[in-house]
Regions:
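Short hydrophobic alpha-helix segments
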Residues: 26, 67-70
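Eukaryotic, compositionally biased intrinsically disordered regions
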Residues: 127-133
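Unchanged
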Residues: 39-63, 71-127, 140-144
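Acidic, metal-coordinating catalytic segment for phosphate/diphosphate chemistry
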Residues: 1-13
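A cytosolic small-molecule/anion-sensing beta-strand core signal
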Residues: 18
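Charged linear interaction tracts used for macromolecular binding and regulation
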Residues: 12-13, 22-42, 46, 50, ...
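Short linear capping/connector segments at secondary-structure termini
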Residues: 1, 29-30, 103-105
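Generic preference for hydrophobic
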Residues: 14, 63-66
């Protein structure tokens, strides 16, 4: 294997909406997050987003467009010793239903003013708010650090 420079990890987060509410999953520690995770080797941002939603919520989705690319340490706590690029992706549900699994114990759709306790290392209130705005703006240009 070729050696090289240390590069950032990629993390995808799916923004899925229904009736002006965003889908969040409940983690084993009782906090809630947008669906997503590390981009696996041989996966693209798009395919990984679709895969993570299926694994964590049992839903089949289309990844529609990129909302933002965030440097994790600028937006989430606690800081990591390595760099992470978080990719927020707007998705549309095609089918499926939630089943509890090894990663998540529940799911629900929440309005911006009734969010449950968040897993702030994965997503912040501001990031979720950004997804609400991006969803409603047809000409959203995307945010990036």
């Amino acid at each position: 294997m070729r050696q090289g420079f240390q590069t950032p990890k990629l993390d995808t987060r799916a923004a899925i909406f229904k009736d002006n509410k965003i889908l969040l999953v409940e983690e084993n520690d009782g906090t809630w997050s947008m669906l997503g995770g590390w981009v696996d080797v041989m996966e693209t941002v798009k395919s990984n987003t679709v895969k993570e939603v299926k694994e964590e919520a049992g839903l089949d989705v289309d990844a529609v467009r990129v909302i933002a690319l965030h440097d994790r340490n600028l937006h989430n706590q606690p800081p990591y010793a390595y760099n992470v690029c978080k990719v927020f992706v707007l998705c549309k549900v095609k089918g499926g239903c939630f089943h509890p699994n090894i990663e998540t114990v529940g799911s629900g759709y929440f309005s911006l003013d009734e969010l449950p306790p968040l897993s702030v290392d994965k997503n912040s209130y501001q990031q979720i708010e950004m997804c609400f705005i991006a969803r409603s703006e047809k000409n959203w240009q995307g945010e990036f650090d």
